[in-house]
């Protein structure tokens, strides 16, 4: 059975239900802020190093595609990509015309 990402509304409820496990994020707003910091930060991190504490899950959850934990991981990965796309620098129109490197 193919794994599917947890819908964001369900992820919000799932995070709130895990407060006793002390995840870094207990709401979507906290999750978005944390993921934005990961995306914008000066160093790259392994997903295991930041998703596990973010969701208060064990690394083994990455190996089981038919669990709520994996569905939450999948949702966080998609959210990471969405936030990355928003924060990614875009070339300016003048750099496209001149061929200048915008980075």
From Swiss-Prot:
Entries under InterPro entries matching the protein: YgfB-like, YgfB-like_sf
Coiled coil spans: none
Membrane topology of this protein: Single-pass membrane protein
Cellular component GO terms held in the UniProt record: membrane
Transmembrane segments: 33-57
Location in the cell: Membrane
Keyword Membrane: yes
Alphabetic keyword roster: Membrane, Plasmid, Transmembrane, Transmembrane helix
Any Pfam family hit: UPF0149
Annotated protein name in UniProt: Uncharacterized protein y4eI
Taxonomic path: Bacteria, Pseudomonadati, Pseudomonadota, Alphaproteobacteria, Hyphomicrobiales
């Amino acid at each position: 059975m193919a794994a599917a990402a947890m819908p964001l509304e369900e992820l919000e409820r799932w995070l709130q239900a895990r407060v006793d496990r002390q995840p870094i994020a207990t709401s979507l707003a906290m999750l978005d802020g944390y993921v934005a910091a990961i995306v914008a930060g000066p160093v790259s991190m392994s997903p295991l190093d930041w998703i596990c504490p973010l969701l208060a899950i064990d690394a083994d959850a990455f190996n089981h595609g038919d669990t709520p934990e994996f569905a939450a991981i999948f949702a966080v990965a998609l959210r990471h990509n969405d936030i990355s796309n928003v924060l990614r620098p875009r070339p300016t129109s003048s750099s496209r015309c001149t061929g200048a490197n915008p980075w």
